[in-house]
């Protein structure tokens, strides 16, 4: 019997998502305007934030762009925020958007070099704990100079490469033949167990790398977008930023690496999976075949990609241009010198990041609601009202950490630094206290936010990437795997803020490493940013 038109509409709405999920989204869309108009806009705002987090948490059931987008469109339509405010948010975050559009595509054209390097690392280090440390440390080191999203894009690209090599061979095909690695139909039972273990192995490496980006990203002014904003407001340069953060970031970095080693050794929280022998064998064979089949043309490509990698690191570390523009230069150089000149070959590079870029635009419209409905105002006012300076530092760190878990850490950091700047200009706090608070804000937004994927853009990118469903990495799984790190990073960071920050900063002043700033810093950034 053919389906009625009404049923067809219902069936088409959100496609293959479960029925309960469709009902949930429709009920959100019905409830929100009622709460906004008849109860309280403030409550409606928080309700929207919770609903959006729900769509992120269910990313494996349905990509969050559609349900989150519907919620955002309705929020704008009923007046929770305006299209102008959304545009303002997008303009303020144009660097992040450019980065996603161009840099991630640029990394796609560096794939051969990345696979070459990481295959050597993966096969060269036998101990899983040492390998995890290597991934975590490498991600941290790179994130101190590059953007965390760029680093995660590199790691994702490598992991997809490793996954597809094994999946192809396990499905009974040759290494070089075409293959769809999203389908598990052709796998024998024996290889399914290996595949599950391999997925767990890749999951743990990706999470170590993800946390590594947070460990490294907090230390320097170029590590995360909000660091740049905070450094700009405080008039700190690269060296001063590094030194001022050190009392908190160094202990956190050491404890983060110790946590990485511990969870692997103890095999807890979903860590500890080893690389199955069959998979290692396939990867070794793949490496041998690649070496044999490598022509001079391939070697030339690797050299070119190596040179471009040097340009990438130098360009980003010295901030020679906006990150996205450096990404665009990578696309142009890599394609021109490796002979990729057809339009359809270029198109594939953009497939990975554009859905996420669209999702991020929706995310910024939710941020616009947070600004227009002043959802964070009660928290900010309460913290600024605390009299005792030491307590105020700790409170700032905690409040920042909690808000960063729900919202984008760029947004939270920006809102806080603006409020503190206003307090400085109005003479409520001294310049030295402002500098200490800036450290508390930076570490508060960067460290505890590893708790959930919405806190760290790099985690959100990983969760919504094409790789996440392949290795069965869900929102819940990420939260659980991040838990030991969340606890250690948040507590050690708090310890640093409470016990180390003031005495160490005084010592830095006395040693002449940093100088006292006089008067207020740059004027507060306009609007929400």
From Swiss-Prot:
Chief localization: membrane
Coiled coil: none
Membrane topology annotation: Multi-pass membrane protein
UniProt GO MF annotations: sodium:proton antiporter activity
Catalytic activity: 2 Na(+)(in) + 3 H(+)(out) = 2 Na(+)(out) + 3 H(+)(in)
Transmembrane segment boundaries: 13-33, 34-54, 90-110, 113-133, 149-166, 205-225, 241-261, 306-326, 327-347, 351-371, 451-471, 479-499
Keyword Nucleus part of the UniProt annotation: no
Keyword Transport assigned: yes
Protein keywords: Antiport, Cell inner membrane, Cell membrane, Ion transport, Membrane, Sodium, Sodium transport, Transmembrane, Transmembrane helix, Transport
A single Gene Ontology CC term: plasma membrane
Localization terms from the record: Cell inner membrane
Function in brief: Na(+)/H(+) antiporter that extrudes sodium in exchange for external protons.
Family that this chain belongs to: Belongs to the NhaB Na(+)/H(+) (TC 2.A.34) antiporter family.
NCBIfam families: NhaB, PRK09547.1
Protein name: Na(+)/H(+) antiporter NhaB
Originating species: Vibrio vulnificus (strain YJ016)
Gene name of the encoded protein: nhaB
